């Protein structure tokens, strides 16, 4: 079973409409909020892989690297959907501009993120995870 940490509470509350992002994998969704060390301490005790489902922006990448990848290395990964480049093309420029000053020198320690970070800077846009919530009837 793969543990998926969901950064945004709206996404967590409507997680069924985003299950498609994880294919046929058996997953356990957990909320990153409220922020505390409890989730990290629990993850340390179990052998499962961890996927971080957060915003596709520099702040989200910073959160993932400092709170998860730092502790588990390649046992942790950042969800990068197949269509993220198309979504970034029409993403949020204002949020990118706001974050750029703070995170422009962000050191990427998980090399699997180099492509995503390159796209973010290339388009000068970010994409919030709420965009992956599909409309569906429960």
Regions found by a protein language model. Give the residues of each.
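Active-site cores of enzymes that catalyze phosphoryl transfer or operate on phosphate-rich substrates
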Residues: 3-10, 117, 126-127
């Amino acid at each position: 079973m793969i543990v998926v940490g969901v950064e945004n509470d709206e996404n967590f509350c409507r997680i069924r409409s985003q299950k498609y992002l994880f294919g046929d994998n058996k997953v356990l969704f957990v909320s990153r909020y409220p922020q505390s060390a409890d989730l990290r301490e629990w993850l340390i005790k179990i052998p499962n892989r961890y996927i971080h489902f957060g915003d596709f922006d520099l702040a989200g990448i910073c959160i993932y690297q400092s709170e998860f990848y730092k502790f588990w290395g390649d046992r942790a990964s950042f969800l990068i959907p197949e269509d993220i480049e198309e979504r970034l093309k029409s993403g949020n420029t204002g949020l990118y501009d706001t974050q750029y000053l703070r995170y422009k020198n962000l050191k990427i320690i998980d090399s699997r993120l180099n492509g995503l970070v390159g796209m973010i800077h290339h388009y000068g846009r970010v994409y919030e995870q709420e965009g992956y919530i599909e409309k569906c009837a429960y």
